[in-house]
Amino acid sequence: MKIIDEIILYENPDPLLVSKQGIFPGIVKLQDNSLLALFTIGQAFDSADQRTYVSKSFDDGRSWSKPKPLHNHIYKNKEESESLKPLLLQNNKLLAIGYAFVRPDSLTPIVNPNTFEILPLNNKISISNDNGESWSMPKNFNVNETPLEISGPCIQLQSGRILGAAPPFHLKESDHSGWISYSDDEGENWSKLSEFYKSKEGHISTWECRLCETNSKIIVIFWAYDNKNKKNLSNHVVISDDAGKTFNTVIDTKIRGQASNIMFYKDDIIFTIHCHRENPTGLILRKVDVRDNKFSILDEINLFSKDGLSSDDTNISKQFGSLKFGQPSILHLNNNELLICFWCIHDNQHIIKTYIVNI
């Protein structure tokens, strides 16, 4: 594997005049082979004015259109800072699914640094019927009355069912689990299908879950964090043979990564990508064989490695607040190319960056 191109999808065009920080990207390929990216722009990493923006590429990710807001709603009372990821349905309808924090004012942080309580969170969905040119105002939905950290894209199974993987969003020392949620009516109604992971003591979080469907399996990868001992664990993987209803024993990948992602390639081969925020740091793409419910690395490449990428891991709140890069994704462009997308800090600005990788 080798990098053949490096592109900035978004950066603040006027950094000396205004603060516009780009974070949390997600990309889908549309029916006409164009690419659509959703990402968040706000004044700061946790600012109350964060909104979802839309950008398109018509040349396999080599250039991108000027981003435009997904919606122009003006909040009269409390603002909502949002993050949404795209999903293309089989009927070519587009969904943007994620969450928004309800902000009482512009200076109250998402996480209370003393109590670790988080602000109220609403799960959100928006719909586009015109290839992403216009979108409905994001509306609330709920899964068992539980706010979920839906930070990654949902998937639509071959059966038509939509699945999402996410944990209930809280920072307590226990009562953590990873949920599979589903919708059988294109996102109108949602329910909990299963728990893909829960530790015996409930002290391990399943942050930034991502999932994919292979020919016969559902695979979920997640950032495992031990809240009791306040430390990161290796990325973990779970596999389902019955469309997400039940999951086999968890697989410790032995990869010391945090935010990660996963893409089905062919047969029993997947690609994974991992943010390594503990030394040695980097953004590592891996080709993996998952035959017989194992995790065998076939090849890997470090795409993004430089000094100063590590995070403060004193506790999970400080870790969230000191991130330098994250939320990587993998998109298969053609037989030999993958598009890797993530956010990172460059010249004191949060930007959206991509790599084209020949595999």
Over which residues does each language-model region extend?
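Asp-box/BNR beta-propeller blade signature and adjacent active/binding-site loops
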Residues: 1-359
